[in-house]
């Protein structure tokens, strides 16, 4: 299994400048217990080449860079406002190694949709990433529906954090069961429920079981802490095709080592860390040696 070149579907801009700006923006924000325990900062690399070297060492072929937009629930401003150009510096310089996901601001719907259109059609982004909590609206709010319609039009997935949120924001808005309502209205929309959905893991599994266009993101948790129900689902006939590995900034090498230690079948491991992402996001990857 160690020879499988992994694809991380969930990461952030990791330049020193971006991380410094993010750390400065968080001053005066509510910092919760878990965020303090993790050090309160995303990882950074001194250069794109340093990041590529770390990816190579861990056996990671591609990393998705999200244009994350996070509204402060406490102070009411966009305290993470990733710019399209910040993602493009990755995807234009190393298009074989980095994949872009556009962002969405439900307070600026028209502008967001225009930028998503440009990101996908002109720059080859493979989808959209949403962090809803600080905006204080649920995933099935009417202000989210223009995004879902646009993703259906462009035939790209929308990845969204579901479950609890680490930052000082209400977690209730990210209940995975809300995806059920969304899919009732957009049955062809391809959705990734990122961050495992904890503590509502079984809600996310149930929605994935019901709808053929829902995937579960195995990210933001070190695999040894995954709920047994999720590991069992990954190893199941249905779940092996509907789970995607990612890190959300956690260390690649240790994450993959822990994932291999869960006892997944080799074919399941390959699907979770690579093949499912290739299929869902329609990625161009090298054909394995010996393939027809």
Question: Where in the sequence are the language-model features?
Answer:
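Active-site gating/metal-coordination segments in enzymes
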Residues: 61-62, 67-160, 164-166, 170-173
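Alpha-helical scaffolding within the catalytic cores
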Residues: 46-54, 82-88, 114, 176-179, ...
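Short aromatic-enriched loop/helix-cap "lid" or pocket-rim segments at secondary-structure transitions
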Residues: 17-22, 75-78, 113-114, 170-172, ...
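Conserved, mostly hydrophobic/aromatic
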Residues: 10, 55, 87, 100, ...
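Flexible loop residues that form catalytic
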Residues: 12-14, 68, 133, 196-197, ...
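Mid-to-C-terminal alpha-helical segments outside catalytic/metal-binding sites
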Residues: 1-62, 118, 238-244, 252-292
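N-terminal cationic-hydrophobic initiation segments that often serve targeting/anchoring roles
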Residues: 55, 91-95, 120, 183, ...
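Catalytic pocket-lining loop regions of alpha/beta-barrel enzymes
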Residues: 122-127, 136-244, 287-291
